[in-house]
């Protein structure tokens, strides 16, 4: 869809949370393995509450009062106290542990976390901020919304951001915005009875890199 006017950008509000959860579901549904809809719902909420605990900022793109994109930044090693979010995350984690589908997806989630740890930059130069989640609704892509979201953090903070990306993420898009792959690891995975090599790469953007439109 070609937009007739430029989208607006602002900090997320509580009323946006349901749409952000929907974006998380859309982004990850092809990476999870499930037959029961409650498994998908619990995984979505587990990821959402995890992002809320570790967030620095949550920026949304809106078009005609509709949320069409979101960018969440934060530090996975420095979470907020956030007792309500932590309680809800723990609840959905336990519900997933009680089912075979849930345990299988949690096992894969833990493997991905281990892969990320292998890619972590040296402790002598830690990365100040991570992009935890970036998503633009498919109907509104190719309108510069992803670029606009990245510009929000480039103007708000003078820092170098990093992002972990797997083979289903838009790596070419991030590379066009100055992100450079620093390292990559892979492992074999079975999803829906198909085996494939899953990879996770660590991308980093140096400060003052220009953002392409």
Regions found by a protein language model. Give the residues of each.
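Conserved active-site alpha-helix within GNAT-family acetyltransferase domains
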Residues: 147, 167-191
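Active-site rim helix/loop that mediates acceptor-substrate recognition in acyltransferases
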Residues: 36-58, 63-64, 72
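Conserved acetyl-CoA-binding loop-helix of GNAT-fold acetyltransferases
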Residues: 136, 142-155
């Amino acid at each position: 869809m070609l937009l007739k006017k430029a989208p607006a950008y602002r900090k997320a509000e509580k009323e946006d949370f349901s749409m952000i959860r929907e974006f998380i579901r859309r982004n990850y549904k092809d990476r999870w393995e499930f037959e029961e809809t409650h498994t998908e719902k619990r995984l979505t909420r587990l990821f959402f509450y995890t992002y809320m605990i570790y967030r620095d900022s949550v920026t949304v793109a809106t078009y005609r009062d509709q949320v069409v994109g979101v960018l969440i930044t934060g530090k996975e090693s420095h979470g907020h106290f956030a007792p309500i979010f932590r309680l809800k995350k723990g609840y959905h984690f336990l519900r997933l542990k009680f089912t075979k589908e849930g345990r299988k997806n949690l096992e894969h989630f833990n493997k991905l976390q281990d892969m990320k740890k292998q890619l972590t930059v040296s402790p002598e130069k830690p990365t100040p901020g991570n992009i935890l989640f970036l998503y633009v609704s498919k109907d509104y892509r190719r309108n510069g919304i992803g670029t606009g979201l990245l510009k929000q953090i480039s103007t708000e903070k003078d820092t170098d951001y990093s992002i972990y990306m797997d083979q289903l993420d838009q790596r070419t898009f991030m590379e066009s915005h100055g992100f450079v792959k620093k390292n990559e690891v892979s492992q074999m995975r079975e999803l829906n009875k198909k085996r494939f090599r899953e990879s996770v790469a660590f991308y980093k953007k140096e400060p003052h890199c220009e953002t392409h439109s």
